Regions:
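Short Pro/Gly-enriched beta-strand edge/turn motifs at strand-loop
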Residues: 41-44, 94
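A short, acidic/glycine-rich surface segment
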Residues: 43-47, 106-109
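Signature of the catalytic double-stranded beta-helix
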Residues: 1-40
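Catalytic core of Fe(II)/2-oxoglutarate
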Residues: 70-129
Length: 129
């Protein structure tokens, strides 16, 4: 697992350095890991923003299952944009400090619904003290 996290850290940071200006002000290390398991038929998780304590970037890797990860324009979730998170794909969400973003715009509203047959995902984040 440490190798996986290190490869993501290194790869994302290097890719960011190829962009002018780089979206990453400094190198980073993932230090917060969460496994999310949704049972078959689960309601998922309602529209939310990741906590302010997370910075730079949030990585979500869906390992198994079928569901809908979506971004929303508002907490009511009426306008949803599907994010392809089928197993094997990695989703990147911005967090404060990514590309100089601050405040709420840095933390996109998102949620999970339409869980069919369960869902297993891994989240990697950079938590500030």
């Amino acid at each position: 697992f440490d190798r996986f996290a290190h490869c993501l850290e290194t790869g994302l940071y290097r890719a960011g350095q190829m962009i002018t200006p780089s979206p990453f002000l400094t190198a980073f290390n993932f230090n917060d890991f969460a496994i999310q398991r949704y049972a078959p038929g689960s309601q998922g998780i309602s529209v939310h923003r990741d906590g302010k304590r997370y910075q730079h970037i949030v990585v979500i890797a869906t390992l198994a299952g079928n569901s809908r990860l979506f971004a929303a324009n508002s907490r009511d979730g009426l306008q949803r944009r599907m994010i392809n998170d089928r197993p094997g794909r990695i989703v990147l969400l911005s967090a404060p400090l990514f590309a100089g973003r601050k405040s709420e715009i840095a933390r996109p509203l998102h949620g999970v619904d339409r869980v069919h047959g369960g869902r297993l995902s891994l989240g990697l984040r950079i938590k500030t003290p």
